[in-house]
A protein has these predicted regions:
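Charged docking surfaces used in two-component/phosphorelay signaling
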Residues: 177-348
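N-terminal Rossmann-like NAD(P) cofactor-binding subdomain of oxidoreductases
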Residues: 1-197, 220-221, 226-227, 305, ...
């Protein structure tokens, strides 16, 4: 595609941490160009650079900085919007956009478990996009990105479920402060600390993977049939969610077999060479000290999942460690990959 053919996109919640990450990742995208920025009424009418508390290491693009912010109402000059809105307001705003003919790709939790809304990880459940045909939004649609901690876990589980079957999973997370948004990042409470509770997080991790890994049958999803128990902690790391996983499988196998399956896992985004897709979805590390957020978080531009420390377990069958970038793979980058998948399927 040349520049003139790029698809215009808008960003809802453009001044927040996820909205900023959308801007950084879309700045030089080969298929999409930012045409609209929308945020709260207090920011409306102001230049973006004059109202945003820019926290992204990348420099704010000049052409974005001078754009005027609009209200989050469905009169934007685009037909695709990425939503980084807070869940306190996202539900009705996203629905309003969809009912007015916009395609909404949302990072918010509000519509994730709706019956006809895809909860999408492009490498895991691309067929779930068929649910869009059963939405009643007058030409619009809603597609959701899973919770940031759900994505790394579910990518690790997908090849295991397909090859061996899963009986049960236990996961303990160590989640970066960037996952809590700007207010958490600015808070003194998280400094040199571990907070053993993240509101609503454990419920998401125990249910979202079951929908994502579920089987699509003509017009609905039959959830995957295994149990997940989760404990979620906020730790003093800026980026990168680390998860310690225990798993019981239905078929016997070896660590060598599992590692081989992980390292060779690929799906439509890799086959079609989508712009945001990692070349290798899962990287396995033999070094028992890895993966670590400091060193593996940005592998493949933050879109790959890193796994290490696979070994047998006394209570389950195996245990291992998963790492993924929470604001790229787990938020804005994952949502952009969803849009790319939709584009090649003529759904935009």
């Amino acid at each position: 595609m040349n520049t003139k053919e790029k698809i215009k996109v808008g960003i809802l919640g453009a001044t927040g941490s996820v909205g900023q990450k959308f801007i950084a990742l879309l700045a030089n995208h080969p298929w999409f160009e930012i045409s609209e920025l929308a945020a709260s009424e207090k920011s409306s009418g102001k230049k973006y650079k004059d109202t945003v508390n820019w926290i992204i290491p990348n420099e704010l693009p000049k052409e974005i900085g001078v754009m005027k912010i609009k209200n989050c109402t469905p009169n934007l000059n685009c037909k695709l919007v990425f939503s980084g809105l807070d869940s306190s307001v996202a539900g009705e705003i996203e629905k309003d956009f969809a009912q007015n003919g916009y395609t909404v790709i949302s990072n918010s939790k509000n519509h994730r478990m709706d019956e006809n809304v895809p909860l999408l990880i492009p490498e895991v459940n691309p067929e779930h996009l068929e649910l869009i045909k059963h939405q009643k939004f007058n030409g619009g649609a809603i597609v959701t990105n899973p919770n940031c901690s759900t994505i790394g876990l579910t990518i690790a589980l997908k090849p295991l479920l397909d090859n061996f079957g899963i009986e049960s999973v236990n996961v303990v997370t160590m989640q970066a402060i960037s996952g809590g948004g700007i207010e958490v990042m600015k808070s003194d409470v998280v400094k040199n600390n571990v907070i053993p509770f993240i509101s609503g997080e454990e419920g998401k991790m125990e249910t979202e993977p079951l929908k994502i890994l579920g089987e699509f049958n003509s017009n609905k999803i039959s959830f995957a049939n295994f149990s997940i128990s989760a404990q979620c902690n906020r730790v003093f790391v800026f980026d990168g969610h680390t998860e310690c996983v225990q798993i019981k499988l239905k078929k016997k196998n070896t660590t060598k077999e599992i590692i081989n399956i992980w390292e060779n896992f690929k799906s439509i985004p890799q086959i079609k060479d989508l712009p945001s897709a990692p070349k290798q979805v899962i990287h396995y590390y033999e070094d028992e000290n890895l993966p670590q957020p400091k060193y593996q978080c940005d592998i493949d531009k933050g879109m790959a999942v890193s796994i290490g420390r696979l070994r047998t377990d006394n209570l389950f069958d195996f245990k291992f460690v998963v790492l993924s970038h929470n604001t790229i793979r787990g938020a804005a980058g994952g949502a952009i990959l969803c849009a790319e998948l939709m584009h090649i399927n003529s759904l935009l």
